[in-house]
């Protein structure tokens, strides 16, 4: 690219109405991308764990709550570049210092956040470790289910 970064590989997991458009764009711009389509959960997790950075590209206005894939990112122990507008997730990502929140639909902010994590291995590793801690504290079903039961029982 124009900044001299040429050893990035993007792995796009999942499917959607713009998949073909993204594939064409990546080919036209000569971006190293692997488009997997939908994967079985186990395959997705294995591939996710091999990644250095996760990008959570949620369409503006889409997700009103914390979605399952952010738990997968956290469990994988990788930092997140987050475009999701959900305040709960933005705040928890910030509190745990587990990634970078960017303005939804700001491609420049997203690219800059990826570049920051790419260029600074120390931050990338620290944010990944923090995200794993987030998974253990907030997304571990054994812990969270017990908290739900206690709340229901009024304890």
Question: Which residue ranges define each predicted feature?
Answer:
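Flexible glycine-rich beta->alpha loop in the catalytic core of nucleotide-sugar glycosyltransferases
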Residues: 60-61, 68-71, 79, 84-88, ...
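Short alpha-helical segment that forms part of, or immediately flanks, the ligand-binding pocket
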Residues: 42-46, 67-76, 89-91
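Nucleotide-activated donor-binding/catalytic signature segment of Leloir-type glycosyltransferases, i.e.
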Residues: 7, 11, 20-46, 53
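A short, well-ordered alpha-helix in the C-terminal region of glycosyltransferases
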Residues: 109-112, 116, 123-138, 147-150
């Amino acid at each position: 690219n124009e900044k001299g970064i040429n050893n990035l590989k993007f792995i796009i997991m999942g499917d959607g109405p713009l998949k073909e458009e993204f594939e064409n764009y990546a080919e036209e711009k000569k971006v190293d991308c692997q488009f997997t389509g939908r994967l079985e959960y186990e395959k997705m997790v294995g591939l996710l764990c091999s990644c250095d950075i996760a990008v959570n590209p949620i369409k503006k206005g889409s997700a009103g709550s914390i979605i399952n894939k952010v738990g997968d990112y956290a469990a994988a122990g990788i930092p997140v570049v987050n475009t999701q507008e959900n305040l709960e997730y933005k705040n928890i990502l910030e509190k745990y210092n587990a990634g970078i929140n960017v303005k939804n639909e700001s491609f420049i902010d997203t690219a800059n956040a990826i570049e920051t994590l790419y260029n600074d291995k120390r931050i990338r590793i620290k944010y990944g470790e923090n995200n794993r801690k987030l998974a253990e504290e907030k997304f571990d079903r054994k812990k969270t289910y017990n908290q739900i039961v206690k709340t229901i029982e009024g304890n």
